[in-house]
Amino acid sequence: MIYNSIMRSKRGRDRTFTETARRQQIIACAIDVIAEVGYPQTTIRKIADRAGIAMSVVLYHFGTKDGLIEAVIASKYQAALETVPPAINRARTQTDKLAAYIRSSIDYFDTHRPQLTALAQLGTSYKPHSGKHFGDLGLTPELSEQLAQLDPATLLRAGQKTGEFCYFPVDSTAIALQAAVNAVVEKILRDPEFDVHRYSDDLVKMFSRMVRNA
C-alpha cells in the first residue's frame, strides 16, 4: 500500500502482513472516531477502544497521535490512487479518459464519506506538533510523484497533442475542472441525498463540449 512506505518500523524492517492489517484497522477506526465525535474529542483511548485493542498497540504502530493522523491523511491519497488512475487507464480515447477522470474522482468522494468528514475535521481542528503545513502531511517524495497522476492537465495536454481536443488554456481549464470536481465534497457533506451521479454526468457533458475539437 502507498502509505506502507511512509513509516517503517523502528527496527528498520518491512512490516509483516499482520502488522499491515493491524495498521489498516487502526486507521479505519481513527477515521470513524474523528468523523463521529470530531477531532478535538478524539483520543488514542477512543480509537483503541473502537479497534478492541490496548492503547499501547496503537502507539506501537504509529508512535504518537501525530503519527496516526499522518497515516490517516496518507490513506486518503492511497484510496484516490487506487480509484482514479486505473479508471483513466482503462479508457481508450482522451475524451473517454476525461470522462473517466470526472466519474472516478466523484465516485471516490461518494464512497469515502466518513474519510471526507474526518478530513474536514482535521483541516479545521488539527495542528501538527511538527509544524508541518497541513497540505504536506502524509506526503513523501514518492507519493507526491504518484499523485501527479491525479492532475487532469496531463490528459488535457495529451488530447490537444493528438488533435482530439481543441485549443484552450490547459492550466486554467485543469484548475476549473479540479475545482468543479472537488466542489462535490462540500455538497455531499451538507446534503447526503445529493445526486452525485447526475452531477458527474453534467460535468462530463460540460467539459467534453468545452474541449472537443469541432
Descriptions of predicted regions:
Residues 1-21, 32:
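N-terminal intrinsically disordered/low-complexity leader segments
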Residues 1-10, 104-111, 149-161, 166, ...:
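C-terminal peripheral helix-coil segments that are non-catalytic and often amphipathic
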Residues 22-31, 47, 72-76, 80, ...:
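Generic hydrophobic, amphipathic alpha-helix propensity
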Residues 25, 33-67, 71:
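Helix-turn-helix
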Residues 36-40, 91, 112, 162-163:
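Short coil/turn segments at alpha/beta junctions that flank glycine-rich nucleotide-binding fingerprints
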Residues 62, 121-129:
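Short helix-capping/turn signature of helix-turn-helix
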Residues 71, 82-115, 177, 200:
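Hydrophobic alpha-helical connector segments
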Residues 78-81, 85-86, 118, 129-162, ...:
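Amphipathic alpha-helical packing segments from all-alpha helical-bundle domains
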